[in-house]
Amino acid sequence: MPTINQLVRKGREKGEQKSTAPALKSCPQKRGVCTRVYTTTPKKPNSALRKIARVRLTNGIEVTAYIPGIGHNLQEHSVVLIRGGRVKDLPGVRYHIIRGTLDASGVQKRNQGRSKYGTKRPKKK
């Protein structure tokens, strides 16, 4: 335990904070091209076919990104925008594709949480 005088002289050393989305290089989003679109299964207690894409970013880094929502129109060579945010039950998936921008269409027939899935407001009848 240091004395007050030692703390005044030296101070505490701050630990370096590690980025959770290093491929974005401190940018909020990055554009990229899908190199492969496929499904994979999640970790142990869960069971599903999660839709993911391998994306080559404009800075040359290739990452794995999750495609949120029900149904998508992405295929190889689709241009997408990605953001940070991992998927807890998919190891190695640290990014999300933003729906409703570039080639990624919004989720069809979605009424709640539309802004997160790039869906326009439905027309009133």
UniProtKB/Swiss-Prot annotation:
Which family would the database say this protein is a member of?
Answer: Belongs to the universal ribosomal protein uS12 family.
PROSITE patterns according to UniProt: RIBOSOMAL_S12
- Residue ranges of the region described as Disordered: 1-27, 103-125
| InterPro entries, per database record | NA-bd_OB-fold (IPR012340), Ribosomal_uS12 (IPR006032), Ribosomal_uS12_bac (IPR005679)
Task: Tell me the superkingdom of the source.
Answer: Bacteria
Modification 3-methylthioaspartic acid, positions: D89
Q: Which UniProt keywords apply?
A: Methylation, Ribonucleoprotein, Ribosomal protein, RNA-binding, rRNA-binding, tRNA-binding
Here the segments flagged for biased composition (Basic residues) are 111-125
Q: Which gene encodes it?
A: rpsL
Oligomer status and interactors: Part of the 30S ribosomal subunit. Contacts proteins S8 and S17. May interact with IF1 in the 30S initiation complex.
GO annotations under biological process?
Answer: translation
One annotated Gene Ontology cellular component of this protein: small ribosomal subunit
Pfam families given for it?
A: Ribosom_S12_S23
Q: What does this protein do?
A: With S4 and S5 plays an important role in translational accuracy.
Named from the GO MF annotations, one term is: structural constituent of ribosome
Q: Which Gene3D superfamilies match?
A: Nucleic acid-binding proteins
Protein name as annotated: Small ribosomal subunit protein uS12
Annotated organism of origin: Syntrophomonas wolfei subsp. wolfei (strain DSM 2245B / Goettingen)
